[in-house]
């Protein structure tokens, strides 16, 4: 077995590393591909196996546990990952014959274990093949939390909260949408190109291009990986950004010549979009606690041909000593649950306790931001998550604590809902973008 060129072997290696480290899954995958000898075709299979197995981990473990002669926690972690990858192919990859998935898994179990683990793997997977059509989830009517959690592979606590906030039907639709193949949006940099030029360029390279749903500068491209090696991306003619995030810059209603504060800026997607909408005229002060992350903001601005962004290291929970300006953006640190379609590892790494700690930080930042807004100015609060703890409840608290601010209604055509006129929640199954939240205030 040439391990550096075997997508299944490398998938197991990556899953093992994910469990042993705090690195993001995407970073582990990118690093592994760079070190491997995988063909372009096998890179696609490797990526599908890793992301798919992580995404559907709870569902896969449920299926494996029904046919295993021993508890899953008693199985060697690497061998359990072999079993998960094989089960993922059996349940979700029609193009791979089940027998091939089993045979390859047996080889991997031998490589990561011994002859005994190979025999155990063979027996378990063949039982799963024989009984998979009889596998059943708890009833949706009798136990909706377990049904949705097991069917769509989500932690119980997330499903419980979403059902509490939005009901069973909405939660099932939301979870299903989070498991769909993620689309890729790009934002055309109108300082350098037009949407028509970028569309024609990408189509000439055999890339499928569709218009965004809400914004003229957004395009949707398939396959997603096709733009990574494109010269136009390096030249700054476009920027990879989900349409939900791009809506934020429009919500702030900036004008050329204004001064804008972006208090949690890195990696700079919203700051560079604001500069684009300001026609590169005015000033944007971009803050972040990390100088390393601010360097990424500077690199992105330079590549996009933007000269009005100035970066400054600063902790937005503390007083930055800033003079009031017409526009302030708080893209708050959050749990990121709205991005689980692109980042499936998030669902297994976040907890309700961690979110409660984030809420305290979000309130601190928003309170500090209030003092930087000039009378009549706008303050925009955004997150890429779907918890009312971090969204609606933070906003309700802010308005109660800061009576000199009021909610500023969004234009009626602005997508999102339900909520107050000054709030917009974007749902993947309703709006076909990443989960996102915005609240707009006027001082």
How would you describe each model-predicted region?
Residues 1-443:
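S-adenosylmethionine
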